[in-house]
């Protein structure tokens, strides 16, 4: 499965759990870590965990290997490593503090091109 398909599956999982401000940064040629960063946030610890759990469940259902998941128990910043796609699920407060969008401001936004409830 290609990176764009993985990105869309992960974004749809975020949307299914009503994640807010879902966006993807095209990191190809900018970061050695991943080709895409998918960033979103939830408004509570429970929502952050639900989003991360849904990403993992959808990855499993689609045969996508979850290489690592960090921060789930704390639910402030959960990182889900799907290989060339790394998903950052923040608690709302942490997202504004770390501001990855600004940190990686030279990365263009990737088109997610499907209906989302943002």
Curated annotation (Swiss-Prot):
Keyword Hydrolase on entry: no
Database matches in NCBIfam families: rsfS_iojap_ybeB (TIGR00090)
Function: Functions as a ribosomal silencing factor. Interacts with ribosomal protein uL14 (rplN), blocking formation of intersubunit bridge B8. Prevents association of the 30S and 50S ribosomal subunits and the formation of functional ribosomes, thus repressing translation.
GO cellular component, one term: cytoplasm
Family, similarity comment: Belongs to the Iojap/RsfS family.
Highest taxon, organism lineage: Bacteria
Lineage per the UniProt record: Bacteria, Bacillati, Bacillota, Bacilli, Bacillales
PANTHER family tied to this protein: IOJAP SUPERFAMILY ORTHOLOG, MITOCHONDRIAL ASSEMBLY OF RIBOSOMAL LARGE SUBUNIT PROTEIN 1
Example GO BP: negative regulation of ribosome biogenesis
Quaternary organization: Interacts with ribosomal protein uL14 (rplN).
The keyword Repressor belongs to this UniProt entry's keyword annotation: yes
UniProt entry keywords in alphabetical sequence: Cytoplasm, Repressor, Translation regulation
Organism: Bacillus subtilis (strain 168)
Full protein name: Ribosomal silencing factor RsfS
Molecular-function GO terms, alphabetical: ribosomal large subunit binding
Cellular localization per UniProt: Cytoplasm
């Amino acid at each position: 499965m290609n990176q764009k398909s993985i990105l869309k599956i992960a974004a749809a999982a975020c949307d299914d759990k009503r994640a807010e401000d879902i966006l993807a940064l095209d990191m190809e040629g900018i970061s050695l870590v991943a080709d895409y960063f998918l960033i979103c946030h939830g408004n509570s610890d429970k929502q952050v965990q639900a989003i991360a759990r849904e990403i993992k469940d959808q990855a499993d259902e689609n045969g996508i290997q979850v290489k690592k998941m960090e921060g789930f128990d704390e639910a402030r910043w959960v990182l889900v490593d799907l290989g060339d796609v790394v998903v950052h699920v923040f608690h709302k407060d942490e997202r504004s503090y770390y501001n990855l969008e600004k940190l990686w401001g030279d990365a263009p936004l990737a088109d997610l091109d499907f209906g989302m409830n943002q």
